[in-house]
């Protein structure tokens, strides 16, 4: 039986990241596409996002509308990117070199590595907090934050060192267990804390745009990971099946969690992971320790993903070190950032991660335009910096300067729109259309060139 077969360790050398997966190793079962896009969203983040809608002034009707629209908008590019993995056999960053060139892929790859380190820290802060509370209940002793965090970070690092097969196994088997546990927690919390949120007035257009942008970014953030976990599928796998399974995984985890956050917002003191953890623990009653254990474990599925993809991205950025060393460096930096930022979690989330995600929208716009509308005639990969790479850089900087909304900086267009953040949409469509109309598409490429 497949679940009794231990996962094999991925190649440890840097060269393995830039090469396509050998055909004899492309044996991944297609159901893993669902789990690899489903399990990383299992955690308090979705609950926080749903609860945040109420603090923005949305009632249940508009909150539900924002959840559906935002998740579809954010998940569709990720699902479309997943279909690039089987025929190329490449990681998502390496696959984008057909549009950006070997040199042009380095800036987004480096940004993705930074992004993964940031998410590593964001996921681990509430997980370590939950682990400390769990141990104080069951063992009567609360370890210091740095130690609880170190235990989780070590487990995540080991999984990422082992590589693709181990990460996929965690997504499926640990993910299934977390799904069952979170279902019980969700039903229990909804039973005790459901109060449909009401608002005195319908939200304005600016508020709805901001809410949809936040929700879209929740799934869009996975766009730079997607084919990392589909490239081991056989090359002839129908792309439609890959897209639908990835879409089902993303929407099947994000939408229910955010709706529960919306429904239980009244019982949450503030839209933060710590407040969500406390609220869920209280609502669960005797199941409180299970809530804490599940939240702590949920960080392993998410951060094994982050650490593994980060190791690929660091190598794609031109840092030619063994994959195992790249994974260790990533985990250590994520650990340090989590320890340093634990006391200012909200600022870490908004000021660091939301702004850095502005590069993802134009990058994936170019990648999808190239893959679905470009010429796939086999030619060598562009060796240097393409016009597509220039478009990526220009649009990324322009959308941050004009459209971003954060505590660090608010662009003039965002101020004019009353704080509404439409930079993701503008960046995606402007980059995709500019790339498509500029004639910048390379006339095909060869994955192993």
Q: Where do the protein language model's features map onto the residues?
A:
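Transmembrane alpha-helical segments of multi-pass small-molecule transport proteins
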Residues: 109, 137-162, 176-187, 215-226, ...
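Membrane-water interface regions at transmembrane-helix termini and the short interhelical loops
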Residues: 55-56, 83, 107, 129-139, ...
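Hydrophobic transmembrane alpha-helices that form the core helical bundles
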Residues: 105-139, 299-316
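Hydrophobic, membrane-embedded alpha-helices of multi-pass small-molecule transporters
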Residues: 30-47, 186-192, 201-264, 285-304, ...
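Membrane-interface "cap" regions at the ends of multi-pass membrane proteins
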Residues: 1-60, 207-213, 231-241, 441-449
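Selective recognition of specific alpha-helical transmembrane segments in multi-pass small-molecule
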Residues: 43-46, 69-77, 112-123, 177-188, ...
């Amino acid at each position: 039986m497949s679940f009794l077969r231990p996962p094999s360790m991925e190649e440890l050398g840097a060269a393995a990241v830039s090469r396509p997966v050998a055909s004899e190793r492309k044996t991944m079962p297609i159901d893993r596409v669902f789990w690899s896009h489903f399990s990383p969203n299992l955690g308090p983040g979705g609950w926080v996002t749903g609860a945040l809608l109420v603090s923005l002034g949305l009632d249940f009707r508009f909150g539900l509308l924002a959840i559906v629209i935002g998740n579809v908008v954010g998940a569709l590019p990720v699902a479309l990117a997943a279909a690039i993995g089987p025929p190329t056999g490449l990681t998502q960053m390496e696959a984008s070199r057909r549009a950006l060139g070997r040199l042009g892929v380095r800036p987004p790859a480096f940004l993705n590595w930074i992004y993964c380190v940031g998410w590593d820290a964001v996921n681990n802060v509430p997980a370590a907090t939950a682990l400390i509370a769990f141990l104080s209940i069951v063992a009567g002793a609360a370890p210091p934050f740095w130690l609880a965090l170190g235990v989780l970070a070590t487990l995540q690092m080991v999984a990422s060192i082992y590589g693709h097969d181990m990460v996929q196994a965690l997504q499926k088997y640990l993910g299934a267990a977390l799904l069952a546990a979170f279902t019980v927690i969700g039903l229990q919390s909804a039973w005790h804390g459901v109060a449909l949120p009401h608002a005195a007035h319908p939200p304005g257009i600016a508020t709805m745009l901001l809410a949809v942008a936040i929700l879209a970014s929740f799934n869009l953030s996975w766009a730079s990971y997607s084919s990392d976990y589909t490239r081991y599928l056989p090359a002839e796998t129908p792309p439609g099946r890959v897209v639908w399974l990835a879409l089902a995984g993303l929407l099947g985890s994000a939408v229910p969690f955010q709706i529960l956050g919306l429904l239980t917002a009244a019982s949450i003191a503030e839209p933060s992971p710590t407040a969500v953890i406390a609220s869920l623990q209280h609502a669960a009653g005797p199941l409180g320790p299970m809530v804490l254990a599940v939240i702590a474990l949920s960080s392993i599925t998410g951060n094994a993903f982050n650490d593994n993809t980060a190791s690929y991205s660091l190598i794609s950025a031109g840092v030619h070190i063994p994959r195992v060393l790249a994974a260790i460096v990533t985990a250590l930096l994520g650990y340090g950032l989590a320890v340093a930022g634990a006391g200012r979690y909200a600022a870490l989330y908004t000021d660091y991660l939301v702004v850095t995600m502005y590069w993802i929208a134009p990058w994936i716009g170019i990648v999808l335009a190239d893959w679905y509308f470009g010429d796939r005639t086999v030619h060598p990969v562009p060796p240097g910096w393409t016009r597509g790479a220039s478009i990526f850089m220009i649009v990324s900087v322009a959308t941050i300067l004009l459209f971003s909304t954060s505590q660090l900086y608010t662009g003039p267009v965002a101020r004019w729109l009353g704080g509404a953040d439409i930079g993701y949409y503008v960046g995606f469509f402007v980059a995709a259309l500019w790339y498509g109309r500029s004639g910048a598409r390379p006339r095909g490429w060869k994955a192993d060139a």
